[in-house]
């Protein structure tokens, strides 16, 4: 459920750390715009890549399959699929389970807890410890950015059962379009993928390089806008207890910060 107002007590002014991040991001964006797409394409050809259409990058059983998305991507997917914003995306949060804890269900979307009843209390404690500095005095958990929703077995919500094809392929996020490559610190990096070290054409490498640069700059600009809009919040010792009480009742209240502002949701 999405709530229009955060209701969270806020501080005024930007923090020193926030100002440093803004300056650093502005500098990186300026440098990113000067990157040579032809040189990047040549690097991609040296590495080599050909998609194997295995769908493993969409399945949690084969590794971290979270897909970070920015607001314009959410809107494109929402318009294409007819789903609501919160059916497409959820708050970006750390994972608190291991692949052997997957429950195998495919039809419904993910829930925040991967814990059984026996160790529920320890799970809540572990979960909230990850957010200790991001819980406000009212027990709201503040997160930064969004990820694509996943099923209860933690596979991507758009991965078709059986065919392992993407139901939102024409509007898939840039992370998916450029996987297993990404740019960080102005340098090309790769994720683990069976398609690496396979031949790639000049044309395909150029298209991939263009998409990588577009993704890199778009994500940096989105992050910059988020930190420029960000307003710090009040914290106290009661916040952690309030958050735990909510979890014990089966709900979790997030305040998601992104480039458009803040969104309060209850899951």
Identify the meaning behind each predicted range.
Residues 1-267:
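Short loop/turn segments that flank or connect secondary-structure elements
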């Amino acid at each position: 459920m999405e709530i229009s107002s955060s209701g969270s007590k806020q501080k005024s002014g930007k923090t020193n750390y926030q100002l440093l991040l803004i300056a650093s991001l502005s500098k990186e964006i300026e440098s990113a715009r000067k990157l040579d797409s032809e040189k990047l394409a040549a690097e991609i050809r040296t590495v080599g890549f050909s998609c194997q259409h295995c769908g493993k990058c969409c399945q949690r059983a084969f590794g971290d399959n979270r897909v970070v998305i920015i607001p314009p991507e959410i809107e494109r997917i929402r318009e294409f699929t007819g789903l609501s914003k919160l059916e497409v995306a959820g708050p970006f949060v750390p994972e608190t389970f291991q692949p052997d804890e997957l429950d195998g269900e495919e039809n419904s979307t993910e829930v925040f807890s991967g814990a059984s009843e026996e160790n529920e209390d320890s799970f809540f404690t572990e979960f909230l410890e990850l957010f200790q500095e991001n819980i406000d005095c009212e027990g709201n958990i503040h997160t930064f950015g969004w990820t694509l929703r996943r099923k209860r077995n933690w596979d991507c919500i758009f991965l078709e059962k059986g065919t392992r094809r993407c139901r939102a392929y024409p509007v898939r996020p840039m992370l998916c379009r450029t996987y297993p490559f990404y740019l960080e610190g102005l340098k090309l990096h790769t994720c683990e993928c069976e398609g690496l070290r396979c031949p790639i054409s000049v044309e395909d490498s150029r298209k991939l390089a263009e998409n990588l640069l577009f993704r890199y700059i778009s994500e940096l600009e989105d992050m910059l806008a988020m930190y420029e809009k960000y307003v710090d919040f009040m914290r106290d010792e009661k916040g952690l207890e309030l958050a735990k009480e909510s979890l014990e009742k089966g709900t979790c209240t997030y305040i998601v910060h992104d480039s458009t502002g803040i969104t309060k949701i209850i899951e």
